[in-house]
């Protein structure tokens, strides 16, 4: 397991075709095989361990784009899963990466990873869904949501002004009192998430601070996109997918993960005992080793 020490990931900014800016963080050597990482809700591309030696050994680079309104990325209120998939392809084109890449997504980032694979199948070689969620606005998936997630979707769509105000308030807390704010979130977590977040406190604190940039606008727009019809079908994904999920996940319980795997053609699922929503931090080496084996050798 990599040690959660400060590293030197490289921040970049790409000009998109419509004039917006897309910010991203690159981990590793730009000459190595590329993996796109989609960050979680309320976070940013800064949420990854910086383990340079591991990336060199596996000959991988990770590109972690910030969704619109996050970090250095311009606000885009019309955000959808397909629109961000197109942004990612524009990013790859701007970086001179024409071949198929690996794709990862943590939490709601898993839905963005699926959207990229479904919308641009020629650009995705393989994918990993890490503690993923389902698209809340898809009619078929909705029937598999827990009562809590159905209620959260209803609240986001029915009282959007209240959620916008909440995210604005949270953005101010992250900007003014980051240590106090992450301590508050830790107190609200389930045991499995609490243990890991304490260990990676500084990394996750800074990632959330960037996530709530632009007055929390990006977080709100991401939530709206998540709650609306996704604009793609899960069955359109052609690349092989692997699912990692914790049996003790207190954010997204694993009960509907077999359903998602079935819709992905029987994708393999790793259900990890006693692990929670932050399992990507606990299993980073194994996750990257699996991805390296899924990608063609350069």
How would you label these PLM feature ranges?
Residues 31-32, 39-44, 247:
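Active-site glycine-rich loops that stabilize anionic/oxyanionic intermediates
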Residues 41-53:
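The serine-hydrolase catalytic nucleophile loop
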Residues 55-74:
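Conserved alpha/beta-hydrolase
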Residues 83-101:
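Conserved acidic catalytic loop of the alpha/beta-hydrolase fold
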Residues 147-232:
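Alpha/beta-hydrolase
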Residues 237, 243-245, 249:
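Short beta-strand/loop motif that positions the catalytic acidic residue
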Residues 250-256:
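Conserved alpha/beta-hydrolase "acid-adjacent" motif
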Residues 267-298:
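Catalytic active-site module of serine/aspartate enzymes centered on a nucleophile-bearing elbow/loop
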């Amino acid at each position: 397991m990599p040690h959660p020490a400060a590293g030197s990931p490289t921040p970049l900014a790409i000009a998109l075709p419509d004039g917006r800016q897309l910010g991203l963080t690159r981990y590793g050597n730009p000459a190595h095989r590329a993996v796109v990482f989609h960050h979680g809700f309320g976070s940013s591309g800064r949420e990854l361990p910086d383990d340079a030696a591991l990336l060199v050994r596996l000959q991988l680079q990770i590109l972690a784009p910030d969704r619109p309104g996050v970090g250095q990325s311009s606000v885009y209120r019309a955000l959808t899963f397909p629109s961000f998939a197109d942004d990612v392809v524009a990013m790859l084109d701007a970086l001179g990466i024409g071949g198929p890449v690996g794709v990862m997504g943590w939490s709601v980032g898993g839905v963005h990873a699926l959207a990229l694979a479904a919308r641009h199948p020629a650009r995705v070689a393989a994918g990993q869904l890490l503690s993923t969620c389902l698209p809340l606005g898809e009619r078929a998936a909705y029937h598999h949501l827990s009562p809590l997630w159905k209620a959260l979707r209803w609240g986001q769509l029915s009282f959007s002004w209240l959620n916008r105000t909440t995210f604005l308030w949270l953005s101010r807390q992250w900007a003014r009192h980051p240590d106090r704010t992450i301590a508050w979130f830790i107190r609200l977590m389930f045991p499995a998430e609490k243990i890991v977040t304490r260990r990676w406190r500084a990394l996750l604190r800074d990632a959330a601070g960037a996530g709530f940039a632009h007055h929390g606008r990006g977080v709100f727009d991401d939530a709206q996109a998540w709650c609306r019809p996704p604009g793609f079908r899960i069955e359109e994904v052609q690349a092989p997918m692997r699912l990692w999920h914790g049996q003790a996940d207190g954010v997204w319980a694993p009960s509907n993960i077999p359903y998602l795997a079935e819709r992905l053609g029987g994708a393999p699922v790793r259900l990890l005992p006693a692990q929670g929503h932050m399992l990507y931090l606990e299993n980073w080496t194994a996750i990257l080793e699996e991805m390296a084996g899924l990608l063609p050798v350069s």
